[in-house]
Each structure stands twice: as structure tokens, then as C-alpha cells.
């Protein structure tokens, strides 16, 4: 049969997705260099292994002393190979790094890591050689991301040379540098051992794998990849369901993504990382490498690497008999970590797959930045404090404050002894911004106690009347911190006056009175103490009372220190110890609620300065309170705690002084806190808490400026509280016509500190208390995740222009980040205008688009973004009035799906348009959880030919002739002539009704009929 070739009307396309790293492919045959995603994820699963650095020898055309070629293979990206400072013209005299590989190897890819600090010598144009043969060339971006060169066909070679053709930096094309090179060689071909698709799982049900796992259970290494909609608990597992603790699983829990390899005897390997997930579909890969360790990849990024020379993956577990999706199959009564959600696909391979492939595959679900509506502002985060500044590699506990003059102050713990809390050498640092947080000065230390003494957890406040700025901080002597703080104020009261207590040998008590040290009998000694806590004997310095080796030293308890500035934060006073005024002897710990204080603006207590604090009693039970001043900070008092008066289960009222965890009767501990003001001057204290139905923010109310608190401490069910410091401020302007507060905290369950979220709360009056005071409720009208991923302590401040500044811990103790946003941004629903995936094109796999009845037909449906298809993975096509069921056969790149079916056997020949019938039961969801509507019929714009193409036939003249003979009279003709006429008429009518009659037949019938009746 002759078939005419008909081209499809629409052409398929692939979604281009960006990874955090710039990964470059090198097509050796065509010498073309393109981003790996611009070809639509062409890679196939590949296993490769790193050529051991110990087997590589590096040399270079030239090198700077101390930065030789060996630095490029030392496994440390902080070191580098660098050409001499004298420089050469690289474009005339190219510089190169040569790696001798020890033996001939099949090289599959190379990863080049540029220098991580600065740009000098960073290579852009490059060539890569094997011997004298160019095996790759191209151009790299001038940034610090890893650069991959991937060979479609492995290169058999014993050496690799990387040549710099052009570079950037202080003097373009004068220097060359490389931080690290990794060379990968081909490993054994991976085998897909298990696969499962299209699972809808409800509370762990619906994800059982029925295949044989005997080979899987022996794996010493391998790779698993899973695509799913965002939900919690176990994603997939391999377990012995007859033992409580004999399993491996990969899970998500709140904001944590992790894995657990566990035996009856205990954990063999675990790891987790806090990372933000897409609202819709996500892709995770887990890789186990024997003798090396374990890795996790999420949405195009390698997020976790755990090294282990004993890593043997599943082979270390006994009796493995189940593979499950959406749960960990364990004996009855055990926690199976049940998952509810949808799993697009799961694949398990016998080998550790290539790092670049896993970034590519998981990168199919990389989320693009959402567009901002007009008027919305959100700046990219900048790190205010970074490792190496102020003599420290670690910082924590950000505080932020905007002064009356518009200066923004950012204070921080400068943790010189490491990222941990006290005991530690911790100073107080500060930076200033005079342009609303756009730029910052170089910063300085403003409080530095001697040795490893600590100043931890700062809080800032300015007196609007005097302009004086106060900073309070918790202070410990060397060797002490929250955990080992001793009960007591650190002072001794004598005749109504309180004096600093010093302890000598055998804890003999001394006191400091106007700088002179008195013994326990009240007699003056030869010791004196100056304002810097230096200890003197007969005028000779012999120590410092804050140091552990001093003959006399302060009590090992917490102290509250206050410093102040009268010049907008440029200079600061010496510290003043507030324990003398505010700490009582039943308190074991008294410390700041880090962040900021508050000055009451309205009502009977207007002008009062207050700082949130929290404290513990002798048993360690925590309670929240405030210290306050009514004389512009000259003297300070401490109010009752929010614990005092709370109703316990036994009907008694709690006392912060005596309550214990054993006697608390359902009353949880209240800890770090912040305070805001209601329209009438009433205070609301927001508190971190633990025990007693914790997990949500607690709010206390004060009618007397913080001196006492309402007995009922409200649990706000709207705000998760993962036992992390929170920040809340009053906003100066009305929002939606109402007074408002701004609130920030990780939006996660304990113990995860992830997904930094800023909320807008509108203050609404709702009735009154029994004392007649108005009752205010907070309507949390808007919220936005502004810092996905790791997010710890934070502090908010309103910028001079009305924007909101947020200073937060972005990555442990090393990344102290700052961002600005406006109210329009916080109010905007960024997802509202993000479209669901659209079908971009339809194509068929036929070269000529002509089919016979009964032929197989394939329809490719390409979306404009990555999607998952969940549910009934079929579509129905209408071809020539016949319904054709098409079933999903395969997919490519997450955006192109191929459906296959059969052309109906009873369809007539002809040219037909393909229409896709509307349907339900198939969910097409993207990374932001938007679902594509396919309930309406869709014209694909594709035409297909069934059978031979039928040429158009003109039957008009023949029909006219037949019609003209209808009035003939038989008697006017001879019998023989009439018979001839009837036969000719029969033939003519036959061709008129015959749909496949050709023009030649029709044309021949006309003269035959004419001759018959004439």
C-alpha cells in the first residue's frame, strides 16, 4: 500500500530546568557544548567511580609557590593551583594542568571546581586534551559552581590535560587557577532491580512491592530514586517485618530529609538534613557507596553526604523480606512511619549512579522562582556575619533594631570557641547600616569578657525619650552555662544592700564592696576588684574573678549584663550587672529572651522600658517574664512570671519558684519570649515552650505593663513552635485597616528548624476579660515562607521605609542572613498566579503519520513544565468518530509522556483529526501542586491518514446525466436498447454511491450511459 507522508502540525519540546550548579556536557562527536538540560535530560542511568587521588600525579606549565598543581587534587576546595603572580598572556601562552592517571582508564566525566573565594584566574574558555588530542572544548560560566565535562563515549586514556584559553579576575587572561579536579571512570553497568509506579498511598496502605527482593537484600551498595508529592514519614523502606529494628528507610519528617539503617543492636548509619520541599512534586535520590558512605539528592541538589568506611548498605541487615513504599513494614505495634500521598515512580539500582545523573534526574523537579506581583519587594538574602569576621568562624543568636535616627543595628554572638552555647568563649558583636539594611559596616566587638567567659543572647531597645540604646546579654564566667548554672543571684545581702559574691578556696564566701574584697566575717582584705573584674592583692594583679584559675571568682551562675550607647550605636559603655537588681536567690538561671525589648507607647504604663527574660528555679523548671524600668533605664525591676498563677491539673496554682516537672500538673515550661503591645497598652508575650501540650506558640497577657500576667496562657493552634526562639514586633502602620503585628518562626514540628515563615497578624477586639479589659485576638491573615530550608533563631525589625527586615540563622552557626520585604510581598499569594502545567505539543512517533486499521499508534504529549501523572494513566482519543484507548507507555524528562493504543479495525479509510476526550481520574500535578484541568475535550491539531489516501472524485456531470434520464419512457425504445440503457444506468448509479470510486471510472460511466439511451 502506498502511504503519503504527512508531517505533524505541532513539534514536541522539552522543559529547560536549571540546577544550582552549572553542569556542562561535551559532545565529542560534534564538538558541541551545551547545558545538560537544554537537550531535555538525555542521560541514561550510568555508574562511574572517582579515580583515586592517590593514583593521580599532577603537573602544570607554571605554578605559584605554595599553590602548586598538587593542590588541585588534594580533596580540599579551599586550596588551589594558581599560576605565578607575574602572569603571562594566556591567550598567547595557554597555561594548563596535567593529570597522569596511573594507568589507562575509560574516563566518563571530569568535574572541575573553580576557586571558591575571589575570581582571579577562574577559567572561562577551555580545552581538554588526552595526549595531543582535543577531547573537549567550550566555555564555562565565571562563577564558583562545579563544572562537569561528560563524554558520550568514554575516553580511553592515561592522562588528562586542562588548558586555560581565557580567564577572569584581577587581570583577565594573566592568571589561571583551579581549586579541585575530580576524574571519573566508567564502572559496571547498573541493573534496575525494582520499579514501582503510580501509587496513591493512604496512611501507609497501597505501596506494597510484590516482586522478589532476594537480590536486593544482599546489596552492599546501590541507588534509589523516588518522585512523590510532599508529605511526611517513610518514603520507601526495605525491612525484616518480623523484627522491630531491622530496616532501612528514607523519610521526610517536618523539614528534615533523612535515612536510617538500623539493626536490632542499634543504628548502623543515620543522617538527616533540613531542606525545603516543593509544595507539589519532589524527587529524592539515595546513594550508598560501599566503604565510602551515603548521599541524598533533592530536586537537583546534593543535600547530604555522610562518610563511612564501614558502609555496606543492606548486606549488614538480616532477614530482609519486604520492600514497601509509604511505610516501614515492622511487627505489629511498631511505628511504621506511615505516609499519605502519591508516588509517581520508584526505582532501585544495583550500583551507585553518577553524581551528575542524579542531579539531572532529581533536577527535573527543580522549582523555579515565583514571579512577584507589582509592588511586592523581597531582597535576596545577604550574610551580615560570615566565617572569619571578628576573629570567629561561628556566630549565633541574631538581634536587629532600627533606631530613631534610622540606623539599623545587628548584634550577634561571636562564638570564638565553636558554635555551641556557653560554656564557650563568646563575645558580643555588632554591625550598623545607615541605608536601611542595604549595606553594612565592617562591624566590631562591643563586649568581650576575659578568657572563655561568655556574653550570650543579646537583646536591643532604645528609649524614645532619651535616645539611649540599651543592649542586655546573658553573661557567664568561664566554665559555666545554662546547663550547669548554680542556684543563686551571685550576690550577698548585708544590711539591706547587695554585694557581689566571690568564692575562694573551699567555697569560702567573700563580698566586693566599692571595689574592696571583704571576708565572711565582714573584714576588709588585701584584695581589690576593678571595673574590669581584675583581681588584685596588695595592688598586684593576680587574676580575674571571671576566670576559672582565679584565687577568688564569681559564683558559677548566670548574670544579666547591660551596656548602652548614646551615639546611635557607634560606641558602647562598660557593662553593668543587673543581677543585683533583678535576680533573686531562688533562681538558678536568669537570661535574656533574645531579640529586642519594647517601650510601652500607650496607657498607664506608657514610657516603661522592658526586656523579655526567662528563668529557671532550683529544679531547672523554666518560666518567662520581663524586666522593666520606669526611670529611663537607671534602675530595673523584674515582674512575676507567666508561670505564676497558672492552673494545674490538681487545682493548685503554679509558682515559678517551686514548680518542678514532677509537680507541674500539665503546666508546661515557658522559655525564650518576645513582647508586643495591644492598642490600649496591654501586653502580649509570645513564648517558646516545652512539655504540657507544647508544639504551638503560647501567649500570655499583662494588664499592668509586665508586672503580672493573666493566669490563662493561651495556646495558639495556628502557629507551630518547634522549640525555637521566635520574633514578633508591632508594625507602625495599619494593615487592611487594622493594627498589626509581624511574627517570624520556623514553620515546622519539633525538632526541625526549617522553613522560616513571616506572618501578619491583625489585632481584633473580641469582648472583654472579667476585669473589664478588652480581649484582643490575633487573626493571622497572611503568611509567607521567606527562608526555605534551614532556619533557626531570628529577629524582625521595621526598616525606616516601612519594609520588614529579617535577620536569621540560615545555616547553623555559620550563616547569619538578612533580607528585606514589604507588606505587599507578605500579603501576596505567589502561588495564585502560577499556572498549572499546559500541554505544549502533541506528536506521534510515526514517520509518515499514516496508519492501517489495527496498527499501533503512539501519541507524545509534551507539557511546558515537569509534571507527575497519578491515577488512571490512560487517555481516550477520538479518531474518525472511533474512540481509541491510549495507555501511558513511558516518559522522558518529566515533561514528555508517550501513550500507546491501537487504530480500530473497523475504521474507514480517511484523513482524521485526533481529539483527546475530556476525563477525570487522572491527576496531572506540578512542583507547586497545581493540577491541570483535562475535563474538556482537546483538539490536538494532529491529522492522521487511515488507509490509502482517497483522491477527490467529481461526480457532478454523471449525476446530472442520470437525473436527466429519469423521464425516459420504455415504450419509446426497443427492448434491446432499453436493456442496454438499464445496464448503463445501473453501472452509473453504482459509481455514484461508491465512496472509493476513482475519477476514471466515473468519467467512463458517463459516455456509456449517453450512448445507451441516445
Swiss-Prot record:
GO CC terms in record: cytoplasm; extracellular region; intracellular membrane-bounded organelle; membrane
Catalytic activity field: Hydrolysis of alpha-(2->3)-, alpha-(2->6)-, alpha-(2->8)- glycosidic linkages of terminal sialic acid residues in oligosaccharides, glycoproteins, glycolipids, colominic acid and synthetic substrates
Name of a matching Pfam family: F5_F8_type_C
Location in or out of the cell: Secreted
Residue ranges of BNR repeats: 431-442, 563-574, 627-638, 700-711
Domain F5/8 type C positions: 39-186
Superkingdom of origin: Bacteria
GO biological process: ganglioside catabolic process; oligosaccharide catabolic process
Active site per database record: 421 (proton acceptor), 912 (nucleophile)
Major place of residence: secreted
Record-listed E.C. numbers: 3.2.1.18
Broad EC category: hydrolase
Binding site for substrate: 396, 688, 873
UniProt keyword list: Glycosidase, Hydrolase, Repeat, Secreted, Signal
Function description: Sialidases have been suggested to be pathogenic factors in microbial infections.
Protein's name in the database: Sialidase
Organism encoding this protein: Clostridium septicum
